[in-house]
Swiss-Prot record:
Homotetramer and heterodimer. Component of a multiprotein complex. Interacts with SPMS and SPDSYN2. Residues 45-282 form the PABS domain. PANTHER family: SPERMIDINE SYNTHASE, SPERMIDINE/SPERMINE SYNTHASE. One of its GO terms (biological process) is spermidine biosynthetic process. S-adenosyl 3-(methylsulfanyl)propylamine binds at Q76, Q107, D131, E151, D182, G183, D201. It comes from Arabidopsis thaliana. Residues 1-35 are annotated as: Disordered. Keywords: Polyamine biosynthesis, Spermidine biosynthesis, Transferase. GO terms for molecular function: spermidine synthase activity. Pathway: Amine and polyamine biosynthesis; spermidine biosynthesis; spermidine from putrescine: step 1/1. Pfam families: Spermine_synt_N, Spermine_synth. This is Spermidine synthase 1.
Length: 334
């Protein structure tokens, strides 16, 4: 039995862009102006190169064997290609979202860092995560009774099911209720205290994901969580985005009255090779994110394949920060 899917047209909003249409103005040879997307990519014979104003002065490249899909949804450009070294690759608006080789690191950590930190989570909300990888990981927890998921872009869901079946296997779980719509609006309409955990699997704070990094969104998350409930959100790279991380930490310390922590992990195909997570809990039962208390019963989720990255040791290690980041993040506690 597959996941239930509903379409919430009242939750759907048009693609929003930053100033100047979310674009960089480029000058052509004849002097005319043209626009490039805020995140853009190029293919120079046989290579995909990822560039963005979020990491200026550098590019991240993979050798392309074959382009498998290229489309444009209401919200973003979607590309899937077969790479020479990382398997199939999903790209949104010119930015790599996952590869078959290293997706396990991100999906497992963003899911199990929060869910292994609280006893017996039953009801979970996933915002974003259209590829289905977080659903696959949430489903490993036998205590889960309901998984609500709100993804704004149905094309991402459909493309993942077609090209990344081992990732999108989470959609086959009958506990999943999929809503195609805007996660910001979905949370505003959620009943107060209705979730044990919220996982925000967003892209970078450009275009359709921008609101998922702002204070009103975090306030909606806190309202939707039960006392002692937890949230884990994608929180950028400490090598590239300390200014963004500072803002996220400040907002979360103001809004969440329980525990507030920053963790990070290695994902080779993400910019700088690492990605961070913000983990917070609401006021209520104490949550010690650094010491997992709810181990995964892998025997209950054999159909989802074995864990490839997460374990209890790497869980605790994820909260060990380099000195430069620790200094900045801890300063926000005051």
């Amino acid at each position: 039995m597959d996941a239930k899917e509903t379409s919430a047209t009242d939750l759907k909003r048009p693609r929003e862009e930053d100033d100047n249409g979310g674009a960089a103005t480029m000058e052509t040879e004849n002097g005319d102006q043209k626009k490039e997307p805020a995140c853009f990519s190029t293919v120079i014979p046989g290579w995909f190169s990822e560039m963005s104003p979020m990491w200026p002065g550098e590019a991240h490249s993979l050798k392309v064997e074959k382009v498998l899909f290229q489309g444009k949804s209401d919200y973003q450009d979607v590309i899937v290609f077969q790479s020479a070294t990382y398997g199939k690759v999903l790209v949104l608006d010119g930015v790599i979202q996952l590869t078959e080789r290293d997706e396990c690191a991100y999906q497992e950590m963003i899911t199990h860092l929060p869910l292994c930190s609280i006893p017996n989570p039953k009801k979970v909300l996933v915002i974003g995560g259209g590829d289905g990888g977080v659903l696959r990981e949430v489903a490993r927890h036998a205590s889960i009774e309901q998984i609500d998921m709100c993804e704004i872009d149905k094309m991402v869901v459909d493309v993942s099911k077609q090209f990344f079946p081992d990732v999108a296997i989470g959609y086959e779980d009958p506990r999943v209720n999929l809503v195609i719509g805007d996660g910001v609006a979905f949370l505003k309409n959620a009943a107060e205290g209705s979730y044990d955990a919220v996982i925000v699997d967003s892209s970078d704070p450009i275009g359709p994901a921008k609101e998922l990094f702002e204070k009103p969104f975090f306030q909606s998350v806190a309202r939707a969580l039960r006392p002692g409930g937890v949230v884990c959100t994608q929180a950028e790279s400490l090598w590239l985005h300390m200014d963004i991380i500072e803002d996220i930490v400040s907002n979360c310390r103001e809004i969440f009255k329980g525990s507030v922590n920053y963790a990070w992990t290695s994902v080779p195909t993400y910019p700088s090779g690492v990605i961070g997570f913000m983990l917070c809990s609401t006021e209520g039962p104490d949550v010690d994110f650094k010491h997992p208390l709810n181990p995964i019963d892998e025997s209950s989720s054999k159909s989802n394949g074995p864990l490839k990255f997460y374990n209890a040791e790497i869980h605790s290690a994820a909260f060990c920060l380099p000195s430069f980041a620790k200094k900045v993040i801890e300063s926000k506690a005051n």
